[in-house]
Amino acid sequence: MARKIKKGDTVKVLSGKDKGKTGEVVTVIPKEDKVVVRGVNIVKRHQRPNAQMRQGGIIEKEAPIYVCKVALVCPSCGQATRVGFRFLDDGRKVRYCKKCGEVIDK
């Protein structure tokens, strides 16, 4: 199944503690239907000292958020929108904005 949200997309959070925030998708986790968005859903984790991190402590990192809780921000109209698929004349399947109709994948 084709993914409506991909790595590098700008998304807006629709619900939860970070409602209204926008950020870039860092990672997509298809098996869990989750995405990691930069600057959104920050959680604190207790880190033990190890080879990479000499000093342990409490670190802040982004946690995954469900795909249904975010909406893609259209690059042309700048609004949070649903995504559809259509085939171009050359046979490519591309994503498009359902609000303005512009193709998202170039």
Swiss-Prot record:
PROSITE patterns in alphabetical order: RIBOSOMAL_L24
InterPro entries from the UniProt entry: KOW (IPR005824), Rib_uL2_dom2 (IPR014722), Ribosomal_uL24 (IPR003256), Ribosomal_uL24_CS (IPR005825), Ribosomal_uL24_KOW (IPR041988), Translation_prot_SH3-like_sf (IPR008991)
Cysteine pairs bridged by disulfides in the record: none
Gene Ontology molecular function: rRNA binding; structural constituent of ribosome
Record key words, sorted: Ribonucleoprotein, Ribosomal protein, RNA-binding, rRNA-binding
Record flagged with keyword Zinc-finger: no
Keyword rRNA-binding belongs to the record: yes
SUPFAM superfamilies named among the record's database cross-references: Translation proteins SH3-like domain
One GO BP annotation of this record: translation
Source superkingdom: Bacteria
GO cellular component term of the entry, any: ribonucleoprotein complex
Pfam families documented for this protein: KOW, ribosomal_L24
HAMAP family named in the record: Ribosomal_uL24_B (MF_01326_B)
Record's subunit section: Part of the 50S ribosomal subunit.
Biological role: One of two assembly initiator proteins, it binds directly to the 5'-end of the 23S rRNA, where it nucleates assembly of the 50S subunit.
Family, as annotated: Belongs to the universal ribosomal protein uL24 family.
PANTHER family noted in UniProt: MITOCHONDRIAL RIBOSOMAL PROTEIN L24
Name recorded for this polypeptide: Large ribosomal subunit protein uL24
Upper taxonomic lineage: Bacteria, Thermotogati, Thermotogota, Thermotogae, Thermotogales
